[in-house]
């Protein structure tokens, strides 16, 4: 992001996680004890620099387990409480929805993007969560638990993968890719 600020896309994006999120566990890597984002796009609209974090979900299921512990509170509580995007829960951060999946992952991505903005690498961000329409349980969890905790809901959107990629329909250059994605992901969700 800081090497080529005019054009940027990254997969499994992580950025300054140790300094900004205190994610310094031994053996940490993207997705394991280290916040990562499936796709990060850097874009410009006028004079403004935008981040577009995209998290793809297909068949994941979660058990609703509270992941609150002292280390996570030390890392994330102050970021949640000072967040301009996330509401502070009425009964405090500990044992809140922010420590239950899928909100836990989305919270971490949100505070990482806020840190990128606060350190002037971008001006704002628009968060996308790609979930098949037929994955009711996951969509419902995000819609009913995470989205209500956002200060500005207009900067977070759930897309069905077919909807997101629909502009590519009919373009023969992408026929094989779309066929693969449909068979591999959204065609198989029950």
Give residue ranges: language-model regions.
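Conserved catalytic cores of phosphodiester-cleaving nucleases, focusing on short active-site segments
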Residues: 39-43, 50-60, 109
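A short acidic (Asp/Glu
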Residues: 64-66, 110, 136-145
